[in-house]
């Protein structure tokens, strides 16, 4: 099966996809000072804890449990030259703030990076209210939006770094 597996496949460790994404975000932020992280009071839970420890305020913004505000603030920051990564559970972003994503980010083609964490069915004790299956369909329907779904932590790490350089709106789905 030569050529089908990555050269380092034996060295891959079991790591949460969002942890890999969070590490990639830190690497991207070290090279790109305009990268900022926003969340709806979920910084640690969505994998941004390492970013928060290294950069803190003003590059780390907790907007409260207000996902509509989360993406609207991110859009405003992008309009001023920042590269915002706005994260929440996928059930709430894009689940609760789809209209704001459409209007303030996509129609204006702002380079906001939306991170939908805890996507899918495996959300533990949180149950059906936190499950999100429709996020890819919702986000693919938006103009200018790039939709990404990494397969493992290493891919997620590289994806975060690539997203920081992309000048389009992005959505990444993290399990």
Task: Tell where the protein language model's regions lie, with residue ranges.
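Thiamine diphosphate
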Residues: 1-174
């Amino acid at each position: 099966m030569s050529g089908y597996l990555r050269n380092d496949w034996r060295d891959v460790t079991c790591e949460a996809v969002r942890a890999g994404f969070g590490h990639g975000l830190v690497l991207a932020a070290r090279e790109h000072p305009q990268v900022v992280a926003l969340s709806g009071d979920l910084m640690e839970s969505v994998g941004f804890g390492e970013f928060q420890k290294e950069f803190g305020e003003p590059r780390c913004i907790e907007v409260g449990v207000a996902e509509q505000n989360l993406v609207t603030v991110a859009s405003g920051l992008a309009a001023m030259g920042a590269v915002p990564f706005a994260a929440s559970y996928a059930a709430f972003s894009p689940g609760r703030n789809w209209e704001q994503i459409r209007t303030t980010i996509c129609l204006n083609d702002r380079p906001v990076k939306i991170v939908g964490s805890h996507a899918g069915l495996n959300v533990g004790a949180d149950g059906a209210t936190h499950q999100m299956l429709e996020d890819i369909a919702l986000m693919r329907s938006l103009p200018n939006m790039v939709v990404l779904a990494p397969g493992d932590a290493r891919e997620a790490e590289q994806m975060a770094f690539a997203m920081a350089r992309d000048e389009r709106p992005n959505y990444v789905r993290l399990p």
